[in-house]
Amino acid sequence: MLSINTTRKENELSGNLGKMKITEENKPKKVLGEITNFQRSTQKTPLKQEIKPVVKKSQQVEPLLADNPRRFVVLPIQYHDIWKMYKKAEASFWTAEEVDLSKDMAHWESLKKEEKHFISHVLAFFAASDGIVNENLVERFSKEVQVTEARCFYGFQIAMENIHSEMYSLLIDTYIKDPQERDFLFNAIETMPCVKEKADWAMRWINDDSSSYAERVVAFAAVEGIFFSGSFASIFWLKKRGIMPGLTFSNELISRDEGLHCDFACLMFSHLVNKPSQERIHQIIDEAVKIEQVFLTEALPCRLIGMNCDLMRQYIEFVADRLLLELKCDKLYNKENPFDFMEHISLEGKTNFFEKRVGEYQKMGVMSGGNTGDSHAFTLDADF
């Protein structure tokens, strides 16, 4: 009887223990310690989550940079102003073979030593710089911008920059007969510190992952609008003397192209939602101005061809102010154009197409609005 009662009490006790809730007071110390250690370990080492690439907030809301599944198809046109720029560039196509250099050598031989030095070094800078512009277009802008119309322009700009680089290389190859000097000029980024400084500044923007697309658009507008301006002016200065017709004609074509590229950069900038502050834009432009001024007044002084260095410095600031206005910013220097001969050089030009195909040079019919016009229709009405 006693054993039966004892067994019954043991069963009741074990049943009650099974129903008991474990609290902090009655929890065994060993179990409590294990749970606490587990909680600490899970707090220290959270579960790994998939790491997603960081996208800047500014890029998330930029229509030009937003993912565009229709970027592979041209029509329908969404950005008519950008498309118009592309067609304008397309109409301005030319090739290096169209520039006659046959008369240049006689003039080259008559130049002074310092004039040859200046021209050859300017050409060396130009030959290298177009490749740097293309590096930016291929590696950055063409990958970032998702708007079809803009990608069309960038694609065509790449082709034209290649032609510019070919043209400058042909000029060096034509004028410079010494193989060592020629090699020195072709490798100007490595052999000429003044060219390297300009190249390094441009390359810095290509490799800068912290700067926004808007900042880099401004920087490369400065490359094509400021870094080239003084050198273009110096070659136009030679045109006043009626010498080097091949050099000066190619300079007109290339300066017109670069003017269009700079205008396109400003157009792209106008479409951006998130723009840098005016102070930041002024900073970028001023850096480019100072580098260009040193290049043409100290490292490679334009007085070598008879130009005034102070006026060249002023001209570079004038060009920078003009670019700032295009970017809808205040002027930074408030300078007038000191070179009256540059006032008569329009990037679109006034020369008759059939006389010399210079400024108004464009492929026939490209700007007429496509193949819908009657001027391109095939008829049998003509008199033979």
UniProtKB/Swiss-Prot annotation:
Provides the precursors necessary for DNA synthesis. Catalyzes the biosynthesis of deoxyribonucleotides from the corresponding ribonucleotides. InterPro entries: Ferritin-like_SF (IPR009078), RNR-like (IPR012348), RNR_small (IPR033909), RNR_small_AS (IPR030475), RNR_small_fam (IPR000358). There is no sign of synthesis of a corresponding large subunit after fertilization. The authors suspect that the unfertilized oocytes contain a stockpile of large subunits ready for combination with newly made small subunits. Fe cation 2 binds at residues 161, 224, 258, 261. Belongs to the ribonucleoside diphosphate reductase small chain family. It comes from the Eukaryota. It comes from Spisula solidissima. Binds 2 iron ions per subunit. This is Ribonucleoside-diphosphate reductase small chain. Its cofactor is Fe cation. Pfam families: Ribonuc_red_sm. Heterodimer of a large and a small subunit. Its EC number is 1.17.4.1. Fe cation 1 binds at residues 130, 161, 164. It catalyses: a 2'-deoxyribonucleoside 5'-diphosphate + [thioredoxin]-disulfide + H2O = a ribonucleoside 5'-diphosphate + [thioredoxin]-dithiol. One of its GO terms (biological process) is deoxyribonucleotide biosynthetic process. The active site is at residue 168. GO terms for molecular function: metal ion binding; ribonucleoside-diphosphate reductase activity, thioredoxin disulfide as acceptor. SUPFAM superfamilies: Ferritin-like. It is an enzyme of class 1 (oxidoreductase).
